[in-house]
């Protein structure tokens, strides 16, 4: 971003398949800029419940292990929506209904026919969301774009320089960096910076 008190322009550059810079940098005049920081599944409740989690880059990160309609390995516990993977708002809503119908069936209701129809709608809606998620999965070249003043931990306003200085004075593990700087310990609990 160019400008000090306000946005005056931005710089863009082509990236290769791994998001590493490639080619010339182009400056563009602009008075505003929209940034997308990616979406990450909210897995706090399932994780605290003891539901096993797995890393699924195609779903946006760590997600609870579950069956097709939200059933987990804990009997009678179902999960749904963006907490199970980033598939888009329409798919999240439909997935919530599917999980609800599965829970109702677990309790004795007959919902198989209704779930089959809803599952087709969910699959259609999820295709778009999953395609968008695939485009936003961070790739290795992203690290090459960081500069000393790049914010790594948004909640604690920690830059790349802060983190590197902590390592230089002896922090030899992620936990040591967390202890020294509170990196990953803000309101998001490391949700956004954990992979940085």
Describe each model-derived feature in a short phrase.
Residues 1-181, 185-187, 191-196:
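Residues forming the flavin
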């Amino acid at each position: 971003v160019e400008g000090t008190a306000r946005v005056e322009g931005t710089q863009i550059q082509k990236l290769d398949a791994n998001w590493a810079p490639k080619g010339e940098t182009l400056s563009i005049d602009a008075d505003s800029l929209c940034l997308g920081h990616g979406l990450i599944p909210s897995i706090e409740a399932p994780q605290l419940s003891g539901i096993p989690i797995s890393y699924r880059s195609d779903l946006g990160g760590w997600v609870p292990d579950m069956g097709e309609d939200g059933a987990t390995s804990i009997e009678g516990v179902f999960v749904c929506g963006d907490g199970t993977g980033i598939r888009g708002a329409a798919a999240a809503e439909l997935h919530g209904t599917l999980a609800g119908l599965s829970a109702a069936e677990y309790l004795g209701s007959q919902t198989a026919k209704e779930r089959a129809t809803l599952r087709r709608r969910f699959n259609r809606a999820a295709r778009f969301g999953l395609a968008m998620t695939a485009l936003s999965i961070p790739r290795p070249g992203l690290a090459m774009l960081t500069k000393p003043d790049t914010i790594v931990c948004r909640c604690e306003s920690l830059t790349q320089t802060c983190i590197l200085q902590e390592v230089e004075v002896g922090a030899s593990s992620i936990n040591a960096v967390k202890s020294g700087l509170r990196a990953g310990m803000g309101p998001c609990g490391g949700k956004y910076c954990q992979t940085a």
